[in-house]
Structure formats: C-alpha cells, structure tokens
C-alpha cells in the first residue's frame, strides 16, 4: 500500500474504475466534533488522482456545493456527485442536498452536468449522504429526512432519475453498501444501528 496523494487529515469518499483512477474529495471532515477545524489543505472540490500523484480538479465547489458522496455508473460512463445539505453547526453556505450527474469521456474529462434529483418526496427533503449502484444502474441512496416520520432510510432511483423504490427505517441513514457472496445484501449504516436486507438485485461490481 502506498499514498497516491495526501489531501487532508481524514478519509475522503472515493470512487474508482478500471479506466478512471480514484475520484477524491476534500470535504470538511477529519476532526472530532466540537473542536476547531484544521486548516483546509485544498478547496472543497472533487479531485482526480492518478497513480503518479497528480491531482486534477474535475468538479468545483461552484458546480456542486459541498460535494460528498460520489459513484460511477456500472459502465463508468456517468459520474454521480452528491451535494451535501447544510447540517447543524455548519458555518458555510452548504449544499442543497441533491445529486448531479456528469458524462465521463474517454479522456476521463467530465461534461454535460445535469441535476439528477433533488430528493424531494411528497414535499419532504430526503437528503442523501452515500449511494451505490446496482448492476442495472439504479442508484440506492441513503435518506436523511430529519424528524419526518417514514422518510428516513433508503431511496432508489432509476438511471433516468425516477424514484422506483424506498426502504423506510426508524433512523437517519448515512451510507449504504452491497455485500455478501452474491452482492445481493444491502447494508445500511444508520445513526445508531446497522441494518441489512436481501434485495432482488446485485451491487455493481467494483472496478
């Protein structure tokens, strides 16, 4: 194991693919709550790190405010980036709690940015944090709806941005991951619990 690029004190979200070296973030993480934040080493953007250690900005804060979770489509032709909503105690402007999608070109350049979804369901904001793709390109996204009963858990969206399913949980969910020998068990990391359920699909294979 070796360091590709030193970004900051903490572990950023990352997404990798066979022809797309890891996408890296530099969010305001890595410090215990209640303590003064450390000096940010790089602006809050999405960076592409290649094996040589070179960093290229691929998505700016202006394009996606407070970028957080990111993932590729199964064919690595789309990159999805979550804009984290402003949380308690945040002093910055914060994002809108939505998701944007970009086309990934053969040269690894991003283009054609579009709003994928604003995560509004029945007038309730089901803000995301982490997300994963299944083999059909559907996106399984964590849902943080605060105290709105029945809206925390997981939302599922098809590649066109249409809501096609929900998993309701009694807690806010921060992240999700497919696991098990067949990648057909969805693990959901909630505020105080870890939930798991078998689903009728499989998680997309890693790069």
Please identify what each model-predicted range represents.
Residues 2-41, 82-94, 144-148, 197-200:
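Short, conserved, GDST-rich strand-edge loop motifs in beta-rich repeat architectures
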Residues 9, 15, 54, 87, ...:
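Surface-exposed, flexible loop/turn segments at secondary-structure boundaries
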Residues 27, 31, 100-102, 162:
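Noncatalytic, solvent-exposed loop/strand surfaces
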Residues 135-137, 143, 154-161, 165-171, ...:
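Short leucine-rich amphipathic alpha-helical surface patches
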Residues 174-207:
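Blade-level signature of beta-propeller repeat domains, shared across WD40, Kelch, NHL, RCC1
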Residues 86, 93-104, 109-159:
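Loop/turn-rich, solvent-exposed surfaces of beta-rich toroidal or solenoidal domains
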Residues 1-2, 7, 32-33, 40-45, ...:
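Beta-rich, blade/repeat-based domains predominating
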Residues 43-66, 103-123, 153-169:
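Blade-edge beta-strand/turn elements of extracellular beta-propeller
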